[in-house]
Regions:
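Residue at a conserved register position within TPR or TPR-like alpha-solenoid repeats
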Residues: 24, 82-85, 89, 109
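Short acidic, glycine/proline-enriched loop segments that cap or flank alpha-helices
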Residues: 69-74, 89-98, 117
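N-terminal alpha-helical interaction modules that lie
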Residues: 1-76, 110-111
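Elongated alpha-helical scaffolds
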Residues: 74-84
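Glycine-rich, aromatic-bearing surface loops/beta-hairpins
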Residues: 110, 115-118
Length: 118
C-alpha cells in the first residue's frame, strides 16, 4: 500500500512538473521551461540536460540503474523531460537540438520496453 501511494505521488509530481513546463512553453518562456527541465534533471539524476546530451547512452543508463535494475520511473521521467526539451527546441527553430533530445528520449523508452520483455 505504501509503495502504491509513493508511486501515485511521484506520478502527480511528474504531471505537475510537465504542466509547468508546458505553461512556460505556452507563454513562449523557453528559457524558463529549459531551466525547469534542468532543475528536474538535477533532482532526478544529479546533473543537467547538457551533461545528459554529452554522455553515452550506456553511461546514462548506468545513472538510471540501481543494483542492476533499471529505475523505470526515473527513466520514464527523463524520457518525458527530454521529449519536452525537444518540443521547445523545435518551437525555437532548432531542429538539430530537437532531434537529439527526441532520440535520447526514444532510446530511453525503448530501453524500458526491452527490459520489461526480458
Amino acid at each position: 500500500m505504501l509503495q502504491n501511494d509513493y508511486i501515485l505521488r511521484v506520478a502527480e509530481d511528474v504531471d505537475q512538473t510537465l504542466a509547468q513546463i508546458i505553461s512556460h512553453q505556452d507563454m513562449r518562456d523557453y528559457q524558463g521551461a529549459l531551466s525547469l527541465i534542468d532543475e528536474v534533471c538535477r533532482q532526478a539524476v544529479g546533473t543537467d540536460s547538457d551533461f545528459i546530451h554529452a554522455i553515452s547512452e550506456e553511461t546514462l543508463l548506468a545513472m538510471l540503474t540501481l543494483l542492476g535494475v533499471l529505475d523505470v520511473q526515473k527513466t520514464l521521467l527523463m524520457a518525458k523531460l527530454l521529449k519536452a526539451e525537444g518540443d521547445i527546441y523545435e518551437e525555437q527553430g532548432n531542429p538539430d537540438a530537437a532531434y537529439e533530445s527526441y532520440l535520447i528520449s526514444l532510446n530511453l523508452l525503448l530501453e524500458i520496453v526491452l527490459r520489461d520483455e526480458g
